[in-house]
Amino acid sequence: MLNEKQRISLTDAAERYSSNLTTQARSYLEGRGLTEEVISTFLLGSVVDPIAGHELATGMISIPYRTPAGVVGMKFRRIDDGTPKYLWPTGQKVGLFNVIDLHKPSDTIAICEGEIDTIVLSGVVGIPSVGVAGVSQWKPWFPKLFESYGRILIFADNDVKEDGRNPGQELAKRIKEDLDRAEIIHLPDNTDVNEVMLQYGNDWFLERMAA
């Protein structure tokens, strides 16, 4: 667990990166359907002047893990064709993304894979949402966070990889094992939340919520 000084440092870094968002990064995010308001709310930024420990992320998009107490983690994403596509600071522990939405007055919560998809569901579509960074990052204590919700929706990516794996469906199955009352919403073949929003609009999700 981070102490107050560490949270302040990460929050300051996130705000610095947000203020340094490059034209290229902004164009990339807008191409994913994110508005200026959403980009600002989620403190998305560019690593132009990295703090200690973030040097390898220079030039990448910064995605802060925000909580009511401040930023507790950071993930970075390339917007070019280089590798690795994503980067975590060494030694950083991974929790749920966007736990701020767990504090919203809502009887419904959505769970999906990945940060950008979570931002789309929460910030663009308007469904309170949290994100999991893959099957291995679903923790045994996470189910306790959802006990108060009347409805839990798992928006499961349906994107088959070159090796034949379907990580989104694997994650949905894993979550369902711990949260049996959760509903799995299967996305169209070879899509994720972001792609569905861009192709079909917010109504695709809202119609399934109303079903």
Residue ranges and their predicted role:
Residues M1-S62, R66-P68, D101-K104, A211:
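TOPRIM metal-binding catalytic domain and adjacent DNA-binding surface shared by DnaG-type primases
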Residues Q6, D49-R151, N166-P167:
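Phosphate-handling DNA/RNA-contact segment within nucleic-acid enzymes
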Residues T58-M60, K144-Y149, D192-L206:
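Short, surface-exposed amphipathic charged segments that create phosphate/polyanion-binding patches used
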Residues P105, I185-P188, W204-A211:
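A charged alpha-helical hairpin associated with nucleic-acid processing machineries
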Residues I111, Y149-D163, H186:
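Acidic beta-strand-to-loop metal/phosphate-binding motif
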Residues V120, E170, D192-V193:
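Phosphate- and divalent-cation-binding pockets in alpha/beta enzyme and binding domains
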Residues V130-V135, D180-T191:
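RNase H-like polynucleotidyl transferase catalytic core
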Residues R165-D178:
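Short, aromatic/basic amphipathic alpha-helical patches
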